[in-house]
């Protein structure tokens, strides 16, 4: 039996400071908590759930698989139940990303509508996207934007028996041939997700191999279609990432300002908050504030951070990741939280009830109990943003004096160099030069550390920072994407001074270029961009060498060192389906099935080229990933 945890370790003083204040408030107001307070009392954990051998999809259950009871009432074995649960998780995760893509494409399509505020911010990104999708690149920007949007929307609504044209446009031809031979070309995204739910309902599909193949198809939908599509559209509408310097950390919460915190993933729904804050500044001053600050948090905050150079000064910076949001609200300085997707924690409800924090949801998929729902649509984007900001101003006016005794001003803030992306790196360094550094061995390879943070695999933020340090000291350049970026920022890894933690060769490169050894590559949605970058590197190497180099040969690896939820499982399925070497921690809930475990750990390299590494010790994970990079270098002869 697992022993009861008394506390959760933190990666940095910034988070710890906030949680300690929340604990003090909790003594007075029991409803005011953070995940760090709730986590220790959630033990022991159910071993059947952790192994994936628990099922409750009919009234004869719940059933659990043990040595004495190897089959459920229906006859389902551990292999069936684990594969079914896993497919359901991945289907839900893929559905989340397809929802984001649908809304982003709607925003892009509205560019041609005179009533819509959306405009083309980056024509280069627009033309590049049209080229990737195999569309006409020569038309008027509005026409090209509309064609891209319609191409995406038609594709995600496509039936499952029709192959996804978006997928076939984004993924290299030689990979398409392989997927065709395996029968893995996905159909329309929504249909693939729908049929996954049908398969996993009561007494339907009981073939674990078929369900695992469906997981791979959903992975192929997740990365090349959904993730790549959302960030491509964000580049077009809001500007591609541009290298710049920002301030971040909890200390950006200023008691003299109306502070509006964001939670979610959909920049298309949130960008106009920064404009509305600028427009309504005088109203804020009339309410007694110096102005309005948009506080980036969770993945949408990462998207703001990546595009900070394009935003007005009302964007204050990135304050914290998923598990920091309630702790930030506990400071008493957050006047409103605007949500449109996860990670929007249910516990935020109590900050409205007890600290009068205004809660606004602009997409009902992320409506917190008690939040005001102001539904977004492209034509009303500015109006919705202005209403949300006005509510924040009213909250500031009514709540600050009322809760003055509960306010805590965080001390921790830091400087970051952010805005790294495909175009900005090409402009600053040139990808050919990056490849040359890799070929020469100055940089041994690239490791994308991505996704969530959690509390269960070593503490909030802890493993991500440990792994990043392990990689950079081995001269491996790290790309950060997702909530892990909050960990890297608080640890100072986005500051060029962090080069001193890198190996001699990587340190010299960073010092010469004035960049950190860990590059902020955007939100978890940017995982699709990183996958596409690997495609492009493989294409370049094929052209240079004339050899049939494939994705598994590229000296690049990935890690989700603190995966949290179903979207992360979809991300992992995407990487593995595309042939990428991937490390994960904690152990996924599949160990109750020998077949599923063997497929994921042993059989995948022969199927897709993907390789899964499960390791909870970050020092050992760093060693293994570095070894994998060296194996890839050896295969390339470099």
UniProtKB/Swiss-Prot annotation:
Enzymatic reactions: CO + 2 oxidized [2Fe-2S]-[ferredoxin] + H2O = 2 reduced [2Fe-2S]-[ferredoxin] + CO2 + 2 H(+)
NCBIfam families for the chain: CO_DH_cata
Residues binding [4Fe-4S] cluster 1: 46
Cofactor: [4Fe-4S] cluster; [Ni-4Fe-5S] cluster
Its EC number(s): 1.2.7.4
Species this chain originates from: Methanopyrus kandleri (strain AV19 / DSM 6324 / JCM 9639 / NBRC 100938)
PANTHER family in the record: CARBON MONOXIDE DEHYDROGENASE, HYDROXYLAMINE REDUCTASE
Protein origin, superkingdom: Archaea
Entry GO MF terms: 4 iron, 4 sulfur cluster binding; anaerobic carbon-monoxide dehydrogenase activity; hydroxylamine reductase activity; nickel cation binding; peroxidase activity
This protein's name: Carbon monoxide dehydrogenase
Cofactor note: Binds 3 [4Fe-4S] clusters per homodimer. Binds 2 [Ni-4Fe-5S] clusters per homodimer.
Keywords, in A-Z order: 4Fe-4S, Iron, Iron-sulfur, Metal-binding, Nickel, Oxidoreductase
Subunit comment: Homodimer.
């Amino acid at each position: 039996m697992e022993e009861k945890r008394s506390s959760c370790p933190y990666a940095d003083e910034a988070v710890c400071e906030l949680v300690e204040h929340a604990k003090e408030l909790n003594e007075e107001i029991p409803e005011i908590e953070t995940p760090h307070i709730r986590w220790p009392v959630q033990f022991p954990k159910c071993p059947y759930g952790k192994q994936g051998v628990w099922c409750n999809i009919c009234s004869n259950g719940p059933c659990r698989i043990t040595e004495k009871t190897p089959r459920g009432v229906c006859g389902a074995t551990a292999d069936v139940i684990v594969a079914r649960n896993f497919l359901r998780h991945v289907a839900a995760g893929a559905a989340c990303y397809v929802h984001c893509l649908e809304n982003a494409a709607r925003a892009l399509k509205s560019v041609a509508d005179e009533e819509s505020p959306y405009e083309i911010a980056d024509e280069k990104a627009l033309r590049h996207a049209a080229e990737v999708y195999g569309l006409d690149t020569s038309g008027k920007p509005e026409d090209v934007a509309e064609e891209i949007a319609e191409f995406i929307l038609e594709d995600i609504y496509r039936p499952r028996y029709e192959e996804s044209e978006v997928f076939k446009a984004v993924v290299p031809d030689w990979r398409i041939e392989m997927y065709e031979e395996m029968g893995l070309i996905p159909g329309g995204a929504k249909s693939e997700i729908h049929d996954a739910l049908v398969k996993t309902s009561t007494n339907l599909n009981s073939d674990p191999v078929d369900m695992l193949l469906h997981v791979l198809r959903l992975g192929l939908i997740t990365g090349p279609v959904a993730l790549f599509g959302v960030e491509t559209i964000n580049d077009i509408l809001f500007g591609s990432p541009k290298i710049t310097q920002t301030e971040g950390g909890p200390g950006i919460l200023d008691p003299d300002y109306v502070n509006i915190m964001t939670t979610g993933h959909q920049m298309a729904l949130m960008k106009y908050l920064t404009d509305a804050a600028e427009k309504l500044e005088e109203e804020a001053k009339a309410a007694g504030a110096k102005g309005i600050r948009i506080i980036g948090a969770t993945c949408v905050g990462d998207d703001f951070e990546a595009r900070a150079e394009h935003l007005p000064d009302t964007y204050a910076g990135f304050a914290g990741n998923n598990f920091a949001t309630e702790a930030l609200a506990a400071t008493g300085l957050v006047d409103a939280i605007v949500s449109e997707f996860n990670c929007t924690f249910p516990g935020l409800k109590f900050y409205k009830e007890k600290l009068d924090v205004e809660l606004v949801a602009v997409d009902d998929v992320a409506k917190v109990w008690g939040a005001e729902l102001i539904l977004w649509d492209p034509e009303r984007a500015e109006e919705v943003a202005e209403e949300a900001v006005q509510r924040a101003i009213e909250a500031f006016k009514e709540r600050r004096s009322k809760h003055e005794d509960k306010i805590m001003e965080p001390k921790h803030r830091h400087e970051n160099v952010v805005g790294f992306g495909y175009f900005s790196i090409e402009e600053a360094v040139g990808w050919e030069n990056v490849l040359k550094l890799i070929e020469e061995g100055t940089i041994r390879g690239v490791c994308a550390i991505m996704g969530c943070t959690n509390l269960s695999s070593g503490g909030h933020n802890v493993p991500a920072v440990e792994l990043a340090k392990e990689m950079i000291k081995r001269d491996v350049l790290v790309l950060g994407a997702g909530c892990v970026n909050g960990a890297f920022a608080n640890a100072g890894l986005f500051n060029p001074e962090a080069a001193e933690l890198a190996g001699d060769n990587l340190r010299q490169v960073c010092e010469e270029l004035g960049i950190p050894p860990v590059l902020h590559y955007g939100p978890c949605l940017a995982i699709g961009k990183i996958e596409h970058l690997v495609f492009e590197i493989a294409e370049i190497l094929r052209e240079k060498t004339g050899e049939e180099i494939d994705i598994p040969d590229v000296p690049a690896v990935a890690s989700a060192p603190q995966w949290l939820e179903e979207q992360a499982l979809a991300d992992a399925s995407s990487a593995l389906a595309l042939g990428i070497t991937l490390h994960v921690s904690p152990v996924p809930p599949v160990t109750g099935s020998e077949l599923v475990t063997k497929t994921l750990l042993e059989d995948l390299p022969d199927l897709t080229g993907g390789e899964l590494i499960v390791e909870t010790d970050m020092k050992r994970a760093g060693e293994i990933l570095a070894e994998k990079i060296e194996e890839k270098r050896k295969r390339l002869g470099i």
